[in-house]
Curated annotation (Swiss-Prot):
This is Flotillin-like protein FloA. The chain crosses the membrane at residues 11-31. It is a single-pass membrane protein. Keywords: Cell membrane, Membrane, Transmembrane, Transmembrane helix. Found in functional membrane microdomains (FMM) that may be equivalent to eukaryotic membrane rafts. FMMs are highly dynamic and increase in number as cells age. Flotillins are thought to be important factors in membrane fluidity. One of its GO terms (cellular component) is membrane raft.
Length: 333
C-alpha cells in the first residue's frame, strides 16, 4: 500500500512539470511554424514567453506574411507588439497593399498603426475609394435667396499623409466652406439651380485635400433645395429698425415741443402777472396825478369812457370778456 501511494504522488510533480514545459516550450506551435516555412527556434519561443509576448500571435503573423511573400522578421513583429501595435492588422494591411501594387513598407505601416489609425482600413480606402456624405450646407446667393445643399465627396486614402494628416472632419469643413463661397459668389440662385456642377468645379479647384490624409477624387452635388428669402427678411428687419428709430426721434421731438409749450405758458403767465401788477398801480398813479393837479376830473371821466368803450367793443367781437372790475372813484380833495 505504501508503494502504491508513493507512485501515485510521484505522478503529480511529473504532470506539473510536463505542463510547465509545454507552456514555456510550445512544441506544437514550433512544429506548425517549421512546416509552414517559418524558421524560428524553440528557444526564441521560450524567450518570447519570458518577455510576455504571446508566441502564437507572432508565429501566426509570420506564417501569414511568409505565405504572402512578405519579407519581415520575428524581431520586427515582436518589437511592434511590445510598442503596443496591432500586429495582425499591420500584416493584413501589408498583404492588401502588396496585392494592389501600393507602395507600403513595414516601417510605414507600423508608424500608421502606432499613430492610432486603422492601417488596414486605410489601405482598403486607398484601394476602394470611400464616399462621404456632407451634412446640409446653407448658403445665400447674391440675390438674397438661401440654398440648402448636400454633397457626396469621394475620397481615397493618401498613405503618405496618414501620419500627421487631417481627417474626415477637416474634409467636410473645407467642402462646406467651398460650397458656401461658390453659392455666395453666384449672382442669382437660379444660376446655381441651373448649373449645380459649377459648384463642384469651383470647390475642386480650391485644393481642399492639401495637408489631409485623403485625396479628393470628386465632389457631386446630391441635392439643392431653395430655403428662405434671407435678403427680403433682412430688408424687413432693417425697415422695422428704421421705423423704431424714426418713432423714437418723433417722440423725442414731441417731448421737446411739449416742454417748449409748457415753458411758453409759464412765461405767458409770468408776463400776465406782471401786467396785472402794473395795472394795479394805475389807480394809485391817477390818484397821485389828480392830487398833484396834472389831470382834471373831466380828464379822468374821459379815460373811464374810453375804457368802457374798449371793453364793450371787445365783448361784441368775442375777443375777450368785459372788464367787470369795479374801480372806486379816487378821493379828490
Amino acid at each position: 500500500m505504501t508503494y502504491l501511494y508513493d507512485n501515485s504522488t510521484l505522478w503529480i510533480p511529473i504532470l506539473l512539470g510536463f505542463l510547465l514545459f509545454l507552456y514555456f516550450f510550445p512544441v506544437n506551435l514550433w512544429i506548425t511554424a517549421l512546416f509552414s516555412g517559418v524558421r524560428v527556434s524553440l528557444f526564441e519561443l521560450v524567450f518570447m514567453r519570458i518577455r510576455r509576448v504571446p508566441p502564437r500571435v507572432i508565429v501566426e503573423s509570420m506564417i501569414t506574411a511568409t505565405k504572402a511573400g512578405l519579407q519581415v522578421t520575428t524581431t520586427e513583429i515582436e518589437t511592434h507588439y511590445l510598442a503596443g501595435g496591432n500586429v495582425p492588422s499591420v500584416i493584413r494591411a501589408l498583404i492588401s497593399a502588396d496585392k494592389a501594387n501600393i507602395k507600403l513598407t513595414f516601417k510605414q505601416a507600423t508608424a500608421i498603426d502606432l499613430a492610432g489609425r486603422d492601417v488596414f482600413q486605410a489601405v482598403q480606402i486607398s484601394v476602394n475609394p470611400k464616399v462621404i456624405n456632407t451634412p446640409s450646407v446653407a448658403a445665400v446667393a447674391a440675390d438674397g435667396i438661401q440654398l440648402v445643399t448636400k454633397a457626396r465627396v469621394t475620397v481615397r486614402a493618401n498613405i503618405q499623409q496618414l501620419v500627421g494628416g487631417a481627417g474626415e472632419d477637416t474634409i467636410l469643413a473645407r467642402v462646406g466652406e467651398g460650397i458656401v463661397t461658390s453659392i455666395g459668389s453666384a449672382a442669382s440662385h437660379k444660376e446655381v439651380l441651373a448649373n449645380p456642377d459649377q459648384i463642384s468645379k469651383l470647390v475642386l479647384q480650391r485644393g481642399l485635400d492639401a495637408g489631409t490624409a485623403f485625396e479628393i477624387l470628386s465632389i457631386d452635388i446630391a441635392d439643392v433645395d431653395v430655403g428662405e428669402n434671407i435678403g427680403a427678411k433682412l430688408q424687413i428687419d432693417q425697415a422695422n429698425a428704421d421705423l423704431r428709430v424714426a418713432e423714437a426721434k418723433a417722440e423725442e421731438r414731441r417731448a421737446m415741443a411739449v416742454a417748449v409749450e409748457q415753458e411758453m405758458r409759464a412765461k405767458s403767465q409770468e408776463a400776465r402777472a406782471q401786467v396785472i401788477l402794473a395795472e394795479s398801480e394805475i389807480p394809485k398813479a391817477m390818484s397821485a396825478a389828480l392830487k398833484s393837479g396834472h389831470i382834471g376830473v373831466m380828464d379822468y371821466y374821459r379815460m373811464q369812457n374810453i375804457k368802457a368803450d374798449t371793453n364793450m367793443r371787445a365783448a361784441i367781437s368775442g375777443e375777450g370778456e368785459p372788464n367787470t372790475e369795479t374801480e372806486g372813484n379816487p378821493n379828490i380833495q
